[in-house]
């Protein structure tokens, strides 16, 4: 079994191996969801392979399941394929959430060369620095990209990652997502939410609800996009899922 990280700011997850299909009024998109930079997924079928259902995939399309259980198809150019041990190492690193649209620069200064433009919800690996290094570029964080390059982002653009992506290792056909996540966390599905609320909000449901509302407000002004999950465009399920996800609960 293989794994991958989304290596583009916003990757598209289609519900079919084909990106369009015939609708009642003409061609329509088969987009179902989006994967954001640095998010993990399980690769069920490699590009060009044959799925368990007997579907022959195009040579550039992979069958995936996101870390929160969404099944679909992704262009391989939007993925960085990794081995299991590499993904475990990645998930064990100091991960940070991109809290707003931001640039990754090659230097810790505004004049640096723009390496990538990330959207809210993307994930980066924060790199350790000595006290002297941190003081030398105060206000900037050193981050590792999925392709191994190092860049810098403004500290104010980053938030802690409060959710787990380890369900990618246990997800399998016939197993509910909550059970898959609980399996990797050595708990039970009914305890996932209470444990997240206890960890991040001291067990206060009121504090958790307030945090979800604050995260939701950060998408104000974002246009509606079918299947969207970023500041470029978002739909109703993507909006709710993202707000809860950023507060530590996967739904």
Regions found by a protein language model. Give the residues of each.
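Terminal peptide-recognition signature
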Residues: 38, 216, 236-240
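Glycine-centered loop/turn motifs
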Residues: 121-122, 221
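Short, flexible active-site loops
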Residues: 196-198, 219-228
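Hydrophobic beta-strand signal
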Residues: 42, 122-125
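Solvent-exposed, polar/charged alpha-helical surfaces in well-ordered, non-transmembrane soluble domains
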Residues: 210, 214-218, 241-245
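Catalytic cysteine-centered active-site loop
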Residues: 223-238, 242-251
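Boundary regions of SH3-family modules and the immediately adjacent low-complexity/disordered segments
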Residues: 1-13, 18-29, 36-49, 56-96, ...
